[in-house]
């Protein structure tokens, strides 16, 4: 499988933890996500998530705010950020981590792509 990367994958990113959850985040979910991500960043883990609304977004934002590294695994090409409101966040992630996709540029964020991404 070929991976497309925007940003840098470092050796230290092998020490990573995935943080995923509901797109319809509850206030408690937001609080707990921030708490856990802060602790993982303190322990020098790279945060990996999918750039989706909700828990994924909070995980990436918290990692960046705490000075940690984060990697977003997309269900589209690197040139099509989904959801669109995370475009600025995606730019920040590419500077302080990486955007990764199994799909070439031009690939739209179709439901089947997210399902395949989640299995690989």
Model-derived regions: residue spans:
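Glycine-biased, small-residue-rich flexible motifs in mid-sequence functional cores and linkers
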Residues: 1-120
């Amino acid at each position: 499988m070929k991976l497309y990367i925007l940003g840098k994958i470092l050796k230290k990113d092998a020490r990573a933890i995935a943080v995923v959850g509901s797109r319809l985040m509850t206030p408690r979910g937001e609080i707990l996500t921030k708490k856990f991500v802060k602790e993982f960043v303190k322990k020098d883990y790279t945060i990996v998530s999918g750039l989706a609304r909700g828990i994924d977004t909070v995980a990436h934002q918290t990692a960046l705010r705490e000075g940690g590294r984060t990697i977003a695994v997309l269900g589209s090409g690197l040139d099509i950020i989904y959801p669109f409101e995370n475009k600025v966040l995606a730019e920040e992630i590419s500077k302080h981590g990486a955007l990764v996709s199994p799909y070439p540029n031009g690939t739209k964020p179709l439901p089947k792509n997210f399902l395949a991404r989640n299995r690989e």
